[in-house]
Amino acid sequence: EQPVTVEFEPVESEYPITIPFEAGVGVEREIKLSDIADSVQYVPLETNDKCLIDFINSGKVVKTGKYWFVSSNTRLYQYTTDGKFVRNIGSRGGGPGQFNYFQQIDVNEDTGLIFMLTTSGKINVYEMETGKFLYDIKIPDKETAQFAMLNDTLVATFMLNSSGQQKE
């Protein structure tokens, strides 16, 4: 069974939508943990040779109803909600379903899909229950820094203006 590469044609619509982030800059307020949570639970993660986590990138932990997904730039670890190691998702390399580095993940519990934004201009898609690579989605701009899947084919992205010259 061969992996599939999916390329989507842009759809004419009212997109892109510009969100005025500058309006929120400088508007800070202190929030107590008790304002947003009733309790705190510590979950010790299983440690063995397959799941030695060297570091966790900021904002790179995702919890679903059944799993925790913990990521560094080079590995995505899957754990049960009680901390038992399940598997690593994907692997480093240049083949189908592989990556050199990845920036972020998103998970759709309803469809059981894991979406991984790689640094090579694509989003790898894996099956949550098996870790199997299914297909990848090419993204038009390699400068994409963050993303969210709106459905299985529609992606919202945030692109860095690293040169300071880009207007759109």
Where on the chain are the PLM-derived regions?
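Blade/loop signatures of beta-propeller domains
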Residues: P3-Y42
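Surface-exposed loop/turn elements that mediate protein-protein interactions on large endomembrane-trafficking
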Residues: R29-C51, Y77-S91, K122-I139, Q166-E168
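Blade-loop segments of beta-propeller domains
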Residues: E46-I53, N57, Y79, K84-G112, ...
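Secretory-pathway ectodomains
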Residues: L52, V62-N73, Y77
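Residue-level detector of Asp-centered blade-edge/turn motifs that repeat once per structural unit
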Residues: K63-G65, V107-T111, M149-D152
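Conserved beta-propeller blade signature
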Residues: Y67-V70, L113-F115, L154-A156
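Glycine-rich, histidine-containing beta strand-loop boundary motifs that form or position
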Residues: S72-N73, I89, T118, M159
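Asp-box/WD-like beta-propeller blade repeats and closely related beta-sheet repeat scaffolds
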Residues: Y101, L117-K167
